[in-house]
Amino acid sequence: MAPSPEGVTVVLGAQWGDEGKGKLVDILAAEADICARCAGGNNAGHTIVVRNDKGEKTSYAFNLLPSGLINPECTAFIGSGVVVHVPSLFNELDTLERKGLKVAGRLFVSDRAHLVMGFHQIVDGLKEVELGGSSIGTTRKGIGPAYSSKASRSGLRVHHLFDPTFPAKFRKLVEGRFKRYGHFEFDTEGEIEMYLAFAERLRPFIVDGPTFMHNAVNSGKRVLVEGANALMLDLDYGTYPFVTSSSTSIGGVVSGLGISPFAIKRVVGVIKAYTTRVGGGPFPTEDLATVGETLQEVGAEYGTVTGRRRRCGWLDLVVMKYSTMINGYTSLNLTKLDVLDGFDEIKVATGYKIDGVEVEGFPADLDRLAKVEVQYATLPGWKTDISNCKTYEEFPENAKAYIKFIEDYLGVKVQYVGVGPGRDQNVIIF
């Protein structure tokens, strides 16, 4: 199914990230006019593999740029809620163009997007060292410190690059970091010179962000929004403080792009058939024994950006119910179902108890969350290779039962099912 012809389609991560959003975005972007990023920075990441007419494969890595650029007819937009590390943006752009992807005239950046500077990245590392054993496990890309600058009203936005006061504002920001963290090695004047050079290269891409999106929506363009990270990493609704620094929920789409909530017609929640998490923080269904190791190995669970091993465990429907409540998914994309092919039995978390009392919702207090006793339902496995299934009817009955169990618990239909890493390994149910 294509993006909504009468509004905006949003793809959001429903767990702790790494659900496989990029693959669905890639598929939907084939029929989109505009693909937009609304939040986050180059801390997100996924790889798309494209096969040409000769059967040759080309791999494209996306971190900051919207992956809709794969479609030569699609325009990409980086919204006001994104934080942009300009050197990384052009490095990614140059890499894509060296692989034959023509981007000229198809990429636009909001003038209101905040900038990630080199000192933000240094500070990111210093903060992690300072936290020691309580570190959050960031990607050290400077995302958090850039959002901190934004929240404290001292950050620099894209349009500031063309302001004569940019060098003075930049120096003031660096001096503030020196006062906080001590004098670290940083070439302030060299960084200013580099950014002023980048500014001229960036100029053709810059637009008035809210006006760009308003015109797109009002002219009937098919808009696809590519969410970054996931709901459980949201600054307000995730497992705070083990979260990212932006709004990764449906609310972040509205504020990050400057669009009306009434423009959004479809919200697809992407949910992995089991659960993974990178870095520190609560993970009620984490399995540190055989199950977790099997999921990690079979699912090749290593972070796209950091290369870190992902923590693994059974699907947590308590998390998913909470995620669904906040984001209001109109349908689901269940990914990596094939990873469960080898299990005799599959467990699914259906509730939490603390001291024998059922917990309503998802606890905000991490001390309470650490005490939960996870309640599981056990479903029979299917012990069949489903990686070649092309239709829902081809799935084993127990795989269908697993999908239905999820649908019944959440009250949302599964629309897409991923059965392998390939673009063509995606079953569309409706």
UniProtKB/Swiss-Prot annotation:
Its EC number is 6.3.4.4. It comes from the Eukaryota. One of its GO terms (biological process) is cellular response to cadmium ion. GTP binds at residues 17-23, 45-47, 310, 336-338, 418-420. Substrate binds at residues 304-310. IMP binds at residues 18-21, 43-46, 139, 153, 229, 244, 308. SMART domains: Adenylsucc_synt (SM00788). Plays an important role in the de novo pathway and in the salvage pathway of purine nucleotide biosynthesis. Catalyzes the first committed step in the biosynthesis of AMP from IMP. HAMAP family: Adenylosucc_synth. This is Adenylosuccinate synthetase. It comes from Cryptococcus neoformans var. neoformans serotype D (strain JEC21 / ATCC MYA-565). The lineage of its organism: Eukaryota, Fungi, Dikarya, Basidiomycota, Agaricomycotina.
